[in-house]
């Protein structure tokens, strides 16, 4: 599955003229870098993420207990205009794969992600009657994505009731970040389990690596 994903998604948007390749690259709308229908591997479907949904596709509406633990993608999107943001959900129901692919120009700070991993290994998010205990650990970036950053969050869900705080379940989110010639690429895998399956992470890695390759080829 991972191989077919990477091959299927490695197509490029053509840009002509070597002398003006950079300026032409910068004129390509970020939504053009999303996965086209014809690039979807068998069994996958896609649906757009628009407007405020882009923010909710990251950490939702819960707020962190410490300011430095604001999910890094929030910072990336806060400095980009709406025209320079795009996203889509890529789903493979047979393997319970749901990946949010988000693009933003300009890309944000990768060092901010390093600080997040270092400083926010354990913290709390709260909001809408929910309490999320978050544990953060590094995650290995896929091959052929030099300079990328990655981490995995294990999230213990609980809610408030008349009898106090009730523990619900533990889920996970895995994040991949890349800066590809100024275009920020963020891929997020949600799993209903404490740890994603090998097939789920293989799909995430292939989607991210394929997107990095697609944008790099467009650049020239």
Across the structure, where does each feature detected by a protein language model lie?
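Bacterial signal peptide processing site
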Residues: 19-21
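N-terminal export and membrane-targeting signals
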Residues: 1-7
């Amino acid at each position: 599955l991972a191989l077919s994903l990477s091959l299927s998604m490695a197509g490029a948007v053509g840009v002509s003229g070597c002398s003006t390749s950079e300026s032409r690259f910068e004129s390509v709308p970020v939504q053009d870098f999303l996965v086209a229908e014809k690039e979807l591997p068998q069994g996958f479907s896609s649906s757009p993420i628009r407007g405020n949904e882009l923010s909710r596709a990251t950490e939702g509406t819960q707020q962190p207990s410490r300011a430095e633990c604001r999910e890094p993608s929030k910072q990336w999107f806060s400095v980009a205009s709406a025209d320079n943001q795009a996203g889509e959900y890529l789903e493979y129901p047979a393997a319970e794969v749901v990946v949010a692919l988000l693009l933003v120009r300009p890309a944000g700070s990768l060092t901010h992600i390093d600080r997040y991993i270092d400083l926010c290994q354990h913290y709390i998010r709260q909001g809408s009657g929910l309490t999320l205990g978050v544990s953060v650990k590094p995650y290995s970036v896929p091959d052929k994505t030099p300079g990328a950053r990655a981490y995995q969050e294990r999230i213990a869900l609980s809610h408030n009731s008349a009898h106090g705080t009730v523990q619900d379940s533990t889920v996970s989110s895995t994040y991949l970040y890349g800066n590809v010639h100024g275009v920020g690429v963020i891929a997020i895998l949600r799993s209903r389990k404490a740890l994603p399956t090998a097939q789920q992470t293989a799909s995430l890695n292939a989607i991210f690596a394929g997107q990095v390759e697609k944008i790099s080829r467009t650049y020239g």
